[in-house]
């Protein structure tokens, strides 16, 4: 799944791509396009091979894609140029140059892609429940990190990618309460057991962005647990990871 953002009268266009299970060359349970590098498949023949396959399929060079090692934290890294090494202990990448393509790797957590075509800024953010709260690196803070970065948050466009739905995401009450305190509107009930608490992280994230003044928020309707075209460890214990990428052309 991919597309181009409407950038109006500007000199760059924003491109985003979200992968599915289809494509790639791997075998079950990582069939066929596992973009993770730590989920039990052979890292040399699994995730790394899939990553090379992906960047070739979408017409990017391997050296343009900057991967990060996500840790359910709040560290934002501003990227000035492509690099071969994985960016460690980071959950958000931001760039104001056209060279790096920024991916976020997920299964049930929320991939968040952000862009503002006028100043030429993009970001990829990993958001998930961690330690009883919705752990989110603040991409808006990252945008403000350097000269020429975004100054008006209302111009930022946000895409919330595929994630687990609240109806399938049962959590203990203490976790639900903690997430709701940090990210209002995240709590819901599940269909697993009537009345048990669940988390709809995308609703809570959208609420946070609106509170920050961001108005253009798009929500990919697909749910990882319910959609067999996507990976989910609630379908099978061992499984792969999806990738969501954003870059400028």
Swiss-Prot record:
Q: Any coiled-coil ranges, and where? A: none
- Catalyzed reaction equations: adenosine + phosphate = alpha-D-ribose 1-phosphate + adenine; S-methyl-5'-thioadenosine + phosphate = 5-(methylsulfanyl)-alpha-D-ribose 1-phosphate + adenine; inosine + phosphate = alpha-D-ribose 1-phosphate + hypoxanthine; adenosine + H2O + H(+) = inosine + NH4(+)
Q: What is its EC number?
A: 2.4.2.1, 3.5.4.4, 2.4.2.28
Q: Name one Pfam family in it.
A: Cu-oxidase_4
Task: Provide this UniProt record's keywords sorted from A to Z.
Answer: Copper, Hydrolase, Metal-binding, Oxidoreductase, Transferase, Zinc
Residues bound to Zn(2+) are 72, 109, 126
Q: GO molecular function: any one?
A: S-methyl-5-thioadenosine phosphorylase activity
The entry sums up its family as follows: Belongs to the purine nucleoside phosphorylase YfiH/LACC1 family.
User: What role does it play?
Assistant: Purine nucleoside enzyme that catalyzes the phosphorolysis of adenosine and inosine nucleosides, yielding D-ribose 1-phosphate and the respective free bases, adenine and hypoxanthine. Also catalyzes the phosphorolysis of S-methyl-5'-thioadenosine into adenine and S-methyl-5-thio-alpha-D-ribose 1-phosphate. Also has adenosine deaminase activity.
Assembly and oligomerization = Homodimer.
Protein name according to UniProt = Purine nucleoside phosphorylase ML0918
Originating organism: Mycobacterium leprae (strain TN)
């Amino acid at each position: 799944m991919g597309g181009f953002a409407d950038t109006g009268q500007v000199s760059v266009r924003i491109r985003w791509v979200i992968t599915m299970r289809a494509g790639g060359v791997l075998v079950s349970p990582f069939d066929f396009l596992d973009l993770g590098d730590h989920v039990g498949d052979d890292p040399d023949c699994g995730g790394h091979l899939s990553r090379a396959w992906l960047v070739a399929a979408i017409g990017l060079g391997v050296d343009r894609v900057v991967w990060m090692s996500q840790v359910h934290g709040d560290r934002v890294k501003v990227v000035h140029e492509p690099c071969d090494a994985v960016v460690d202990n980071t959950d958000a990448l931001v760039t104001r140059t056209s060279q790096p393509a920024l991916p976020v790797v997920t299964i049930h957590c929320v991939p968040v892609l952000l862009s503002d075509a006028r100043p030429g800024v993009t970001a990829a953010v990993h958001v998930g429940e961690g330690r009883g709260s919705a752990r989110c690196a603040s991409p808006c803070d990252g945008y403000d990190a350097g000269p020429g970065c975004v100054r008006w948050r209302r111009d930022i466009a946000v895409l919330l990618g595929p994630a687990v739905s609240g109806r399938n995401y049962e959590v203990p009450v203490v976790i639900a309460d903690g997430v709701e305190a940090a990210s209002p509107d995240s709590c819901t009930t599940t269909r697993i057991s009537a009345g048990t608490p669940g988390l709809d992280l995308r609703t809570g994230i959208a609420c946070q962005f609106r509170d920050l003044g961001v108005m253009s928020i798009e929500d990919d309707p697909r749910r990882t647990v319910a959609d067999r075209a996507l990976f989910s460890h609630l379908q099978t214990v061992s499984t792969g990871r999806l990738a969501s990428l954003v870059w400028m052309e």
